[in-house]
A protein has these predicted regions:
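Multi-pass alpha-helical membrane architecture of UbiA-family
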Residues: 1-305
C-alpha cells in the first residue's frame, strides 16, 4: 500500500491479518490441523498429501472460527468479551464475515483435491461447524456438530488419496479403524463441554442453552473429562489389541500416554468441583489432545481399517 497524503504509511493490512487470525479461534484451529496432519503422516501418506490435508483442514477451521466471531459479534459485545477483536471494535464485522466465506470456499476447493471420500467427509465436517455457529449452539443438540466433525476428521486424513488430481496410488480408498473414528467423536464431546465452561454465565445472559449449559458446571466438566478418559482407552485398545498390536516399548508408551491423560482428567475434575471454570480447563483438554496426538502418531498403520 502506498503512503497517505500526509506521508503516513498504510499498515492496516498486517493489522487486519493479525486481527483476523485472532478472530479465528487459533488454539483449536491449530490443534485440529496438527491432529489431521499427524494422522495423515502416521498412515504413510506422502509428504505432499499430508500438506494438502493440513491446508484443507486449516482453511476449514479458520472459516468455522471466523464465522463464530462474526455471528456472535453482538452477543460478545453485550457481555464485554475483551478477547474478541470484533467485540472490541478493532475489526469490522463485515471483514470477518467476508474472511469466513472466503476461507470456507478455499476449504471446499482444497477438499476436492483430496479425493471423493475425503472431500465429502471434510465438507460435511466444515458444514457441521457452521451449523453450530449458526444456531445449534443454542440448543440441546449443540454437541452433535462436535461429534460429527471430530469423528469425521480421521476419515478426512486417512481416506485422502489425491485421486482428484491424478495422484492416487490406485489401491482403492483407505478407511480409518473404527476406534479412530470413535476416539474423534468422544474427543469432540470433551472439546465442546470444556470450551463453554468459562462462558456459562455470559451464555445464560444471552440465551445460549446448549448441551453443556443444561448439564451445569459440574455435569459438563465431568462429562468432558470422562470423555477424555474414554478417548485415551480407545487409543490404547487400538494399539495393544487387534491383528497387529504394538509390542515392547510401544506398549509402555501407550500405557504411559493413557496414564497421563487420566491424570490430567483427574486434575480437571478436581478444578470443576472446586468451581473453577477457567480457561485452565480448556488448556488441560489441549494438553490431553497433544498426548493423544502422539499416541495416534505411534499407532501408525493401525489407524487404517
Amino acid at each position: 500500500m502506498g503512503p497517505y497524503a500526509d506521508g503516513v504509511t498504510d499498515t492496516r493490512r498486517p493489522a487486519t491479518l493479525r486481527l483476523l487470525f485472532a478472530s479465528s479461534h487459533p488454539g483449536p484451529t491449530v490443534t485440529v490441523t496438527v491432529l489431521a496432519a499427524v494422522i495423515a503422516a502416521a498412515v504413510g501418506h506422502p509428504f505432499w498429501l499430508v500438506g494438502l490435508v493440513a491446508l484443507a483442514v486449516v482453511a476449514g477451521q479458520l472459516s468455522i472460527g471466523l464465522a463464530n466471531d462474526w455471528i456472535d459479534a453482538d452477543r460478545d459485545r453485550a457481555v464485554g468479551r475483551s478477547d474478541k477483536p470484533v467485540a472490541r471494535g478493532l475489526i469490522a464485522v463485515g471483514t470477518v464475515r467476508t474472511a469466513a466465506f472466503v476461507t470456507a470456499a478455499v476449504a471446499v476447493v482444497l477438499s476436492a483435491l483430496l479425493g471423493p471420500v475425503a472431500a465429502v467427509a471434510h465438507v460435511v465436517l466444515v458444514a457441521a461447524g457452521w451449523a453450530y455457529d449458526a444456531g445449534l449452539k443454542r440448543t440441546l443438540w449443540s454437541v452433535v456438530p462436535f461429534v460429527v466433525a471430530f469423528g469425521l476428521l480421521p476419515v478426512v486424513a486417512v481416506s485422502a488419496d489425491g485421486s482428484a488430481i491424478g495422484a492416487g496410488g490406485g489401491g482403492g480408498t483407505s478407511w480409518p479403524a473404527w476406534w479412530a473414528i470413535a476416539t474423534g467423536a468422544v474427543f469432540g464431546v470433551a472439546i465442546h463441554c470444556t470450551n463453554v465452561l468459562p462462558d456459562l454465565l455470559d451464555d445464560a445472559a444471552t440465551g445460549v442453552r446448549g448441551f453443556p449449559h443444561r448439564l451445569g458446571l459440574r455435569g459438563a466438566g465431568t462429562t468432558a473429562f470422562a470423555a477424555l478418559v474414554v478417548a485415551a482407552f480407545l487409543v490404547l485398545g487400538g494399539q495393544v489389541l487387534g491383528d497387529d498390536p504394538v509390542r515392547g516399548l510401544g506398549v509402555v508408551l501407550a500405557v504411559v500416554g493413557t496414564v497421563v491423560v487420566v491424570a490430567l482428567a483427574a486434575v480437571g475434575v478436581r478444578l470443576v468441583f472446586a468451581g473453577r471454570a477457567s480457561r485452565t480447563l480448556f488448556r488441560l483438554v489441549i494438553a490431553s489432545s497433544l498426548v493423544l496426538v502422539v499416541e495416534l502418531g505411534l499407532a501408525g498403520a493401525r489407524l487404517v481399517a
